[in-house]
Amino acid sequence: MTRGAKKQRPSTATTELPNKRKPTPTSSGKFDPIKVATRENAAAVDANLPLERLLDAVGSRAQDVVEDGECVVYWMRMQDMRIEDNRALALASAEAQKTKKPLVVIYVISPQDYAAHDRGARRIDFMLRNLRIIKIKLDEMHIPLHVVTHSPRSTLPRRIISLLSLVGAHKSYANIEYEVDELRRDIQVCEIAKKDGMKATFVHDKCIVEPGVAVKKDGSYYAVYSPFQRLWLATLNDYQGRFLDPSSEPAANHKSVRKHEKLGELFNGTVPDSVEGFELDEDDRKKMAEYWPAGEEAALLVLDRFLSTKSRPEQAGGVNPLSQGAEESDKHSRIQVYGDERDRINADTTSRISPYLASGIISARRCVRSTMKLTGSSKVDGGRNTGIGRWVQELAWRDFYVSVLVGFPRVSMGRPFIEKYADIVWEGGDIPEVRAWKEGRTGYPIVDAGMRCIKETGWLHNRLRMTTAMFLVKDLMVDWRVGERYYMQNLIDGDLASNNGGWQWSASTGVDPAPYFRIFNPYLQSEKADPEGDFIRMFVPELKSLKGKEIHNPSAAVAKRLGYPLPIVKHSEAKDRAIRRFKTPGEK
């Protein structure tokens, strides 16, 4: 993208993605956002970055004097659901203290936004569980949490201003969400607030190093991870105060706020049990609550387990990450051996912190500070030679994918980063093989174990995410957007930037991708990641009696005897087909 490119008026034209899912019902009726932007529309958005427009809108009013109003509002979103180390919340609290006004927190449940980003019922239930805990904590500080549900999404900016008017606020603070639709929404909020004599402030919080900092000398965004990571780490170490210092926790309101004419009623509000169109059945709700306990305290405990205890085979599957029995170790904790064991799926070799990061229940800054405390160093270890450094690199990947989302927003509009691959001929998204993939009935044990793990736990080890994704795209030759959507709808840690980045990497269509001719062999991946087949036995019980290499690739006779499906595609033939179609996009 050329920064000095002539700005174009974005077209509203879109191209429908084949085999759209059924519309998601909401309180305002049916709403189906599944569209793919045209190449021209996406290019126009790339040439006029929404984040830059939002920052310009906020910066243009930075010195404006606005009357104090009756309170100060912090607008919490589903990516910053915490009280500790929350930049916008800290700023709102500081303003409230300076002006001697109460602090009010608002939260807007927007079903159409959830549908637009393919949020799943598990993610929404996790959001609600965390909101209830936040409400209790805020209540102890005499800070009301006002939760409302709003549709349609197109009128949400005006609704935000109406909520400010309702509580008598003239100033609001929120952390930036980097998706295109959300940035456009917040630009509108700024514009309406200005017309109404209010000020809406939006600040960076999600990333460790915010988008736009670790960029090339000409100001353009990196599309390759390695140079980004080197600059990211150097910047982080050179300016630790700016990027790593924790934000202050909010100060409590005076208890008299409970008798305030406008604000007192807000304490009586509740968090809904569910959101229409995103309900979980009772069994799944209980299961998710066990596997993924809510709250900041739970998130900190999950992180501490990763930093201080050894991995355990019994923790590989659907279990509470805080289960009893973890053995503490300084030298052999999961993070210390992360570099060697991170690709093994037969134990809890990774942090399991992703659901908490995706919902902002813990800050990424806190994660980095914890590694520094562990090393006892004044510098952040981001190298490849230590387990700690390798894990910090994963946090850098998270920032990298957000940077890509900001610098090349077309990737969040259904477009491949490498545009020539928009013409690849895919098989249909509703072919029987797609259902087999989703259900874990492909005849490839490692793929089936991974897909069944998603259905059971709402989570999947990153190595298996790559393996199952590449199988769908390269072996079945199914559009990567079909899988991207399925992951978002079923994973409790669904994050647009990371999910899109991962899928486009596997599909060879994205930034810093796997070359199109690099195609995982599921059998070899299985032997490397799950050598003894323990993970497969956990999720594919039909094969639990098998041992040795047979569990990775059972013969047709064995599969038939055990009631396990035969492979739905021959890997060698599928590989040749994929290479042929990627080599000449548009030809079959």
Q: What is each PLM-predicted segment?
A:
Residues 346-537:
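Active-site-proximal binding-pocket segments
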Residues 5, 10, 68-69, 220-421, ...:
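Glycine/tryptophan-enriched, flexible segments
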Residues 91-95, 133, 302, 370, ...:
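Residue-level detector of alpha-helical secondary structure
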Residues 76-80, 176-178, 204-207, 229, ...:
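Short, flexible loop/turn elements at secondary-structure junctions
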Residues 126, 130, 181, 295, ...:
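Soluble or luminal CAZymes and related metallo-dependent hydrolases
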